[in-house]
Amino acid sequence: MKDITLVLLAAGDSTRFKAPFKKQWIRIGEIPLWQYVAKDLSQKCDFSDIIIVANEKEISYMKKIERNFKYAKGGKLRQNSLANALKKVKSEFVFVSDTARAEISKDLIGRLINECEKFDCVSPFLGVVDTTYLGRNQIDRNDLKLIQTPQISRANLLKKALESNEIFTDDSAAVAFAGGKLGFVEGDEKARKITFTSDLAHFDFTPASGTIFTGNGFDVHAFAKGEFITLGGVKIPCEYSLVGHSDADAAIHALMDAILGACGLGDIGELFPDTDDSFKGIDSKILLQKVVNFVHLLGFKIINADITIIAQKPKISPYKEKMCEILSEILQTSRVNVKASTTEKLGFVGRVEGVAAIASANLGYFDWRKF
């Protein structure tokens, strides 16, 4: 078997996909598309290594899902992403594909591999069947090729090509620039690319699992002298303030940890460390929106949230409805509940030294069939 590394590109922003989630994070049953594609390709070819190129913020989460792959940070352009992956490639050949090209046949893979010894880069192509013009001049359609992915190249030559400052549209253009020999094989009409949500109708994917994920969070902040405290996004007039790096909204902090916990994304200290001055005094609603946006991109929707605020003073009940209204808008669900409790004058809460909050959240996968 030839020495070939699979590089799967999954760092795109899915701008044209027009959904709350990135296409690489749609769930095929329980697994995200990038993992589904990588495993499907690995069953059709015995790759010496598999490297996933992804957004830097998503890599740590990907590693929790799939520990048998290697990961490389995505770049500004496709070729920057590929160059980052090539630093980890030790094989003679590299097989580069896109997560969006979700169903590659074993026959197409075989055609590419069978030709790779003869050329420096081999690409699949589709012929043009329609009459074609360039401006006002008709072109012989037999001279035209519509290039698809995946492509297989000699790794060292592709690395060399990408060291230049030229902009390349694909691997074949880069290898040609470096003086390499190009080969072409018959492509596959069925090797569709997912660009828009409507493209998903062409794939016979298993729908996203209906699994529910539950997380919980807890937070405490101490009182200082002041004029108001902020809880659940609502300013509550009182003789106190809350001490913290941000606005010390314990209710929202507990809620964020509950959401992150449900997804297995760590805690808010990892996302928004108190050593980062950009978060000094920040409105916690802004941080919550960032958390919601992030879990949405990863394919999760928030089903419901339940928060208990524990405070001897001030009275929380008059503000619960407004808290629910604010949080429902951010979470994009009406299923938000806020409760108030005391400790019957026991402990630091009973001594009016601070407040605590407990939160639970249930999340599920977006049903991509509805988009």
From Swiss-Prot:
Cite the binding residues for 4-CDP-2-C-methyl-D-erythritol 2-phosphate: 219-221, 245-246, 267-269, 272-276, 341-344, 348, 351
User: Keywords of this protein's UniProt record, alphabetized?
Assistant: Isoprene biosynthesis, Lyase, Metal-binding, Multifunctional enzyme, Nucleotidyltransferase, Transferase
The site (Transition state stabilizer) lies at: R16, K23, H245, T342
Superkingdom of source: Bacteria
Q: Which residues bind a divalent metal cation?
A: D219, H221, H253
GO molecular function annotation:
2-C-methyl-D-erythritol 2,4-cyclodiphosphate synthase activity; 2-C-methyl-D-erythritol 4-phosphate cytidylyltransferase activity; metal ion binding
Task: List the Gene3D superfamilies.
Answer: 2-C-methyl-D-erythritol 2,4-cyclodiphosphate synthase (3.30.1330.50), Spore Coat Polysaccharide Biosynthesis Protein SpsA, Chain A (3.90.550.10)
Site annotation (Positions MEP for the nucleophilic attack) points to R141, K193
Record InterPro entries: IspD/F, IspD/TarI, MECDP_synthase, MECDP_synthase_CS, MECDP_synthase_sf, Nucleotide-diphossugar_trans
- Catalysis performed (reactions): 2-C-methyl-D-erythritol 4-phosphate + CTP + H(+) = 4-CDP-2-C-methyl-D-erythritol + diphosphate; 4-CDP-2-C-methyl-D-erythritol 2-phosphate = 2-C-methyl-D-erythritol 2,4-cyclic diphosphate + CMP
Q: What does this protein do?
A: Bifunctional enzyme that catalyzes the formation of 4-diphosphocytidyl-2-C-methyl-D-erythritol from CTP and 2-C-methyl-D-erythritol 4-phosphate (MEP) (IspD), and catalyzes the conversion of 4-diphosphocytidyl-2-C-methyl-D-erythritol 2-phosphate (CDP-ME2P) to 2-C-methyl-D-erythritol 2,4-cyclodiphosphate (ME-CPP) with a corresponding release of cytidine 5-monophosphate (CMP) (IspF).
Q: What is this protein called?
A: Bifunctional enzyme IspD/IspF
Source organism of the structure: Campylobacter hominis (strain ATCC BAA-381 / DSM 21671 / CCUG 45161 / LMG 19568 / NCTC 13146 / CH001A)
Name of the coding gene = ispDF
